[in-house]
Amino acid sequence: MNVMSKLIISNDLLISILLICFSSFFFAVHDSLLKYISLGNIKWYHNIVIGGPFGFIILILMMIFSGGVKKNIILKSYKIPILRGMLSIANPLMAFMALKYISLSIFTTLILTLPFFLVILSYYILNEKIKKTIIYSLIIGFIGVIIILKPEIESFNFYILLPILMSAISGINMIIVNKYNSLASPYGFAFYNLLIPFLLGVMLFINEPFFPDFKTIIFIISSWIFGTLGLLFLTYAYHRSNFYTNRIAPYIYTQLIWAIIFGFIFYKDLIDIYSVIGSILIVVCGINILILKKG
């Protein structure tokens, strides 16, 4: 490999890392705004109906610059994209409920268990082999989850299970994309991923219409813009990274740094020693899995 090739790879790697870090920041802003919204009197379907169109606008703009809208949403088969969309209904509902009752940092930490579920699901669905070191990381990582959960019957917060379920569902969705990637483009999958929950939200909204105050509406729109930008930056980062995704993937954990900062500044969230220990185990094992899985 000549010097010029090394410089190009180094430049692409740096840009991809920056894109991942920006996407993590955008996702953290989205979650912080969603927590504020969830503390009000509106339901998850009010949020998705008011903010969803802005997500669609950004997604459609992305399609226009990626082969056109028709090319991305007109498919030979709609079964798999619609199945993913149906699975995705649970995520906005659970995120809305969870953020109302648990801290931003704990929510983010448990969402970042996604690599654990990807490994497990890849083994059973894609028949991928798992290295022993990854198995050890999974065990230690889930011990970290148990430490955070603190499963004492008297004080157990059942809402803390929701982000874990979200990670499992997201893992299934990502495995489906991996297995059936020829059926649709990433933007096509994302479109139907948003469309199905949005249509359900519209039906529920018609039955119980509600428009919050202007400030909350601005927060809702902003959360959707930041969430969609996070998805855009993340998608583009992986598109650029090609053969070194294992070197950029660990940077998704920078989202936890922002979650801790935003949680403390805006919601006075403080984490106890158990949450700190559990979070460290999850992050270290998650990074280890992301590196080893592609290695």
Protein language model regions, located:
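C-terminal transmembrane-helix exit sites in multi-pass transporters
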Residues: 95-97, 115-136, 255-276
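Hydrophobic transmembrane alpha-helices of multi-pass small-molecule transport proteins
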Residues: 133-150, 274-293
